[in-house]
A protein has these predicted regions:
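Bacterial N-terminal signal peptides
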Residues: 2-10
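Acidic, polar-rich low-complexity tracts and alpha-helical solenoid repeat scaffolds
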Residues: 12-269
Length: 269
């Protein structure tokens, strides 16, 4: 019986056999072992990034709380963070050990998640071209994946870092015209669009996108940030009354808004 159990485990470990047991074994191990630990490391790394970030509330805030100096943006100038390195290692391990590419089709439904984590960890280390490779892999190899919209969001975030704002705008608008995107995916797409428009100083278009992101996001911190940015954009466009209303909305969020947004909303009124 013991020998039979060992044999069954060995057979289940095969990435070349397309049956339910093999698919389930590799999918489960990818999700609850490798990806779980990798995502924990990724979230810790993101927390580190946000903790070291300092907002300049007197200028229009970036939609994403991630500060990159010009030196860091140069090719090869990666930011070292053990958490991001661990996340990348876990993602690579998942792909190398648990991928079940049989007959040109991936049978492990967690591998696209692995590529998404791989791309994110590289993005936060400022390794933008390798990050884009990971996101593109999802878009081209897994066109029906639930992660397609997130892969596109992150790819266009890379394009913004590479100063390809017009390309990001073109790609995201094409997605919005061709697909029915909803919820957090829609919020994230418009947050990237808004950032691209802000960088190109097309503030009316940025305003429209921030409104959608604010409406669709399910995250309290994002909703507060986007509302504050709305106030800043209204100010830039000389819509003083609308700016006042936006800042008041932040104030009225009370504990649902980080204290810094509330303080500066009072100062802006």
């Amino acid at each position: 019986m013991f020998t039979f159990g060992i044999l069954a485990l060995i057979l289940a470990c095969s990435t070349k056999k397309d049956n339910y047991i093999n698919r389930k074994w590799h999918s489960t191990n990818t999700k609850y072992n490798v990806l779980y630990n990798g995502n924990l490391a990724l979230e810790k790394g993101i927390t580190d990034v946000k903790a070291t970030y300092s907002d300049d509330f007197w200028n229009v805030l970036p939609l994403e709380r991630m500060q990159i100096t010009p030196a860091e943006q140069k090719e090869g100038a990666a930011t070292k963070n053990a958490n991001f390195e661990r996340a990348e290692t876990k993602a690579t391990k998942a792909i190398q050990i648990h991928s079940m590419n049989i007959g040109g089709y991936e049978k492990n439904n967690q591998i696209d998640e692995s590529y998404l984590m791989l791309g994110k960890s590289r993005y936060y280390e400022n390794r933008y071209l390798p990050a884009m490779e990971a996101f593109n892999y999802i878009l081209y190899k897994y066109p029906t994946s639930n992660n397609v919209y997130q892969a596109q969001v992150w790819r266009e975030k890379v394009n913004l870092k590479l100063e390809n704002e017009q390309l990001a705008i073109k790609n995201l608008n094409r997605t919005l015209k061709g697909q029915k995107v909803t919820g957090q995916d829609l919020a994230d797409i418009h947050s990237v669009l808004a950032q691209a428009y802000i960088k190109k100083n097309v503030l009316d278009s940025a305003l429209a996108s921030v409104k959608i992101s604010k409406k669709e996001t399910k995250l309290k911190e994002e909703k507060a940030r986007y509302t504050f940015i709305l106030g800043q954009l209204y100010e830039k466009l000389n819509y003083s009354d609308s700016a006042f209303v936006a800042y008041q909305e932040v104030i009225d969020m009370k504990r649902k808004s980080p204290r810094s947004y509330t303080i500066y909303s009072h100062l802006k009124q």
